[in-house]
Regions:
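Charge-rich, low-complexity N-terminal segments
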Residues: 12-149
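Intrinsic disorder/low-complexity segments
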Residues: 1-12
């Protein structure tokens, strides 16, 4: 007698999930508006306008939200997300002077608000369009910004 065979079919309902990846980089910058006088820049930006620049140990949180693939069980391969963050953020910005060493900030004041927006744009080009992207950047443990597109 032959065993009775059957096929197991799993029904997995697609669901929305957010995945997060953290990264870290160090960079220097100077906050400065060329159209303002030296006094106006110092008054507005304070120590962040230091002509010799200053640095931060940035912490980055990247959030990707979308439907989980019912076959793989993944929203996005975390190894790929790590690769995108390394290629688009860490490699171009780590241990760099953002004002002088990057094209992104040659004409754009590297405030935390502008840095998070640039990072979001760089990563958005790598993340599938059907997924939502949010980027949070910590300039200090108490000061952080977030951009969602």
């Amino acid at each position: 007698m032959e065993p009775i065979g059957f096929t197991f079919v799993a029904f997995v309902m697609s669901h929305i999930v957010s995945v997060f990846r953290k990264a870290h980089f160090n960079a220097a910058h100077r906050l400065h508006v060329p159209e303002w006088s030296a006094e106006e820049n110092r008054a507005f930006f304070g120590l962040c306008n230091n002509e010799h620049f200053h640095g931060h140990n940035y912490d980055l949180e990247v959030k990707v939200t979308g439907q989980v693939d019912p076959v793989s069980g993944y929203l996005i391969d975390m190894k790929l997300l790590q690769q995108y963050i390394n290629e688009e953020v860490v490699e171009p910005f780590d241990h760099k002077n953002l004002n002088m060493d990057t094209d992104d900030f040659r004409q754009l004041n590297p405030t935390a608000e502008n840095i998070v927006w640039v990072i979001w744009k760089r990563l958005r080009s790598r993340i599938p369009a059907e997924m939502d992207l949010s980027v949070r950047l910590y300039e200090t443990p108490r000061n952080f910004v977030e951009y969602n597109g």
